Amino acid sequence: MMSTTALDQAAAPEVDADRIREAMEYYWTKEWTDGLPVVPVTESYLNQFLAGVDRDPEEVLFTITHLNRHLTVRLAAINAALAGCLPEYFPVVLAAWEAIAKEPHPARGIWQSTTGTAPFLVVNGPIRAEIGLNSQGNIFGSGFRANATIGRAIRLGCINVFGLHPHKLDQATQGTPAKYSACIAENEEESPWPALHTEYGFDASDSVVTAYVIRSVMHIEARHTMEPEQLALDFVDSICRTGALIHEYTSALLVIVPEHAEVFASAGWSKDDLRNFVFEHSVRRRSELVAVGKDALSHKTRWRLSSEHPDSMPDTASTTDEPDVVRALSHPSSIQIMVAGANNAGVSAVVEIFTLNPPRENPFSYSRIGA
C-alpha cells in the first residue's frame, strides 16, 4: 500500500524518470497507445519475447484484407511488450491471435462496427498458474498483470497494426470497457464440471486460449436461490432481453461463479442440462417484439426491425408451428459455459457474443498455447 512517502518509494533506483516520460510522450504523439502509458520497447527486450517462441518473426498471424494490413509475429511481440506483458506471456498472446484469425468476424471489420465489439479471451490449462492469470475474485476487474496485459496486447495490435483508432477506423457508437482489455481464466479447480477446453477435445493438461467477439457483460445477482430452475431462468432473462436482439439470434457465454455452479451440480445438472434448459426457455412472445419494433427482419441486413418497415421480411419463427413464440438462440451450442470468479457470493455474468445471420453453431475459436 502506498504511504505518504510514496514518491520516494516509487522512484526506482538508477532510472531516469524524465527520459521515461519523454518516451511515453513520444509513443502518444505517434498514436501507439490506447490512451494509457505504454512500456518503452528496445530491440534487446523485444528479442526476449521472440526467443520464447519457435516462430519466424515475419510470419503473418492475422490479416484484415479490406484494410490491406497484416499482423506478424514480430508486430504481435512489439505490442505485447508495449502493453506491459512479460516475455513469458507471449505464447498466450500468440495463440490468442491464432484463435482470432479463425474467427470470421474480425477479418470482416466487426472491430470497426458501430456496435462497439471487443476481443474477449478465455485461458485454460496449466499456463494459468505458470504466469499468474486470475480465475477467481474480481475476474472482470483490475489487479492482475497477466490478465490485464494479455488482453491489452490484442487491443494495442488492433490500434497500432490495423489502425483501429476511435473516431477514425473504429466507429463504435459507445464502445465497451472491454476494448481496453478482456482476458480471463477459468477457475477449473472450483468447477464441478469438465473445463471449457476439454469440450473441444483437448486434454486437461493442455493450455488453450478461446477467442470470442463480444458486445457486453451482464451481471446476474442471485444470492439466495438454491433452485437450479430459478437460477437458470435468471440467465435466460438476460440472454433474451429485447435490447440484445440486434439480429435474428444471439449467443452467450455463461461465466458462472463456483457457488452457482454448485447449485446446478448438486441438483445433478451437467453443462448440457443447463445448456438445453437455457435454449428451450430463451424465447420471446411476438407481441413483446412488436412492442419494441423488432418483430421482423431486414431483407438487406437481417437485423431485427418492425414488420411495418419497408425493408422487412418475416423471421424464421413465422414459418414454425408456433409463430408467436420467437427463439433468441438458434441451437443449444449457442450457449457456452465456464466457471470463474470467487466462491463468496452468488454473482455470475452473461457475456453477450456477437452473432450474425446465419448463426454459427459454435460462436468462438480456439488455439492451443505453444502449438
Show the residue positions of the predicted features.
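Non-transmembrane, aqueous-exposed alpha-helical and coiled segments at domain scale
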Residues: M2-A371
